[in-house]
């Protein structure tokens, strides 16, 4: 894509309350057309009331782009150019944007089962997925939804183990001759309206009577949609939408010990306040009784040995990194994180360090027993699944080659070749780690300044921690790209507005597992301009900032209830000021 690139140049824990993963619609742009906001051109880089000069650059000198136009999410960070990685960045960008094919051209290898054919399908214009009324998968429709399909602990529960018949991120596409594990067109999404909040709050603001509406998704999948053996039963489904990919390299650069301090700081506050620490910090990550990090907070099974940027060794099973990525906090290093993993498991495009398929035994069995699948393979002697051409031979080969345990490059049935090379993966990671954060806007505006003041006073920053320092950024990489330079962000002050921990909001049909990492707020105010949508929260249920904030006080059990209650009780002028602040950072 063509775009301009620019070279530009602590927090005390209080009551944990998350706030406003959201952007606005017509109600949440408080700036009236006849009262235009003064341009910030003469103020950029200068301290303003309530803002330091550095806050104009949320990604620091090495991670911020001055571009605030519709292409800004696509920009490389200044670190990319300063470190001589521009060409690698542009090559890596192609692997994010291009549609993968089955067996043609440089971008081949999709399937045999997959979620999407390209990364861009889930991250429209590099941003957050868009709210959908159906699960249809089509290029450019912005459907960034993944499903969590699980056996609920109780009727209506958000908790329970993932089912084993389909992959953890369920696949709805397949390459011929196979059938998708789940047929996308049979998945139904219904948006329900909240009539009464569990907290008892009326759905209008008491200061002025302005009303608001809250919606949430109900998702159903009939048994006939599954092509697995066995077919799952007693299931529940929750949606999770992708978040934007910008600035993830900067989050990777936050020192591990600083995140550990954040856990300890919040735990100390809750204990001193006489609160149940294990209710406010996930026991999987924080051992309240021992007052220390729990074993589950660390990721150590990388599947491959690795190396640090300074040349040190990072062995799988030995090197332990704190989890910081995904809503569920399942990943640690970005180089083995959501993007590095997703380029494999979303498309099923193999590479030297990913020699196995993202699949399930139940799907392999169903495909090996499907007469239509066997007939198509039997009619094509060139198929890698053809074996000796007999039904029995094809059945055995299909089953074994589709198993998640089979090494695709070294087995007795067919030896495939890696579909993404180590060099291609390296370029992809230069791109992934090199994406910039757009600079802040309108920090000179009095409403924005008041919005930040209220944001801090109301306790929103307790979870949406404004800033971090990056330290030495001694990143980890898998051995297949060890020694190759990736964008590095040493000693930067960054402003993601996230504490990098999980909290609970107790929403209707909440996220699977109930706990959700605090989503960074930086750059989100540009979403509508960049992507055409501004849906927020984990499943895009919030259509603007106001709805996102009000979901934070849907229940009195919400960790953000008191913060959101302050917003609820505020005047429209103050509510609009907070929204304007969120749109500006």
Q: Where in the sequence are the language-model features?
A:
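Bacterial N-terminal signal peptides that target proteins for export
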Residues: 2-10
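Electron-transfer interface patches adjacent to heme c in soluble/periplasmic c-type cytochromes
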Residues: 30-90, 100-429, 433-446, 452-585
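Hydrophobic helical h-region of N-terminal Sec-dependent signal peptides
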Residues: 11-17
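N-terminal cofactor/phosphate-binding cores enriched in small/glycine residues
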Residues: 93
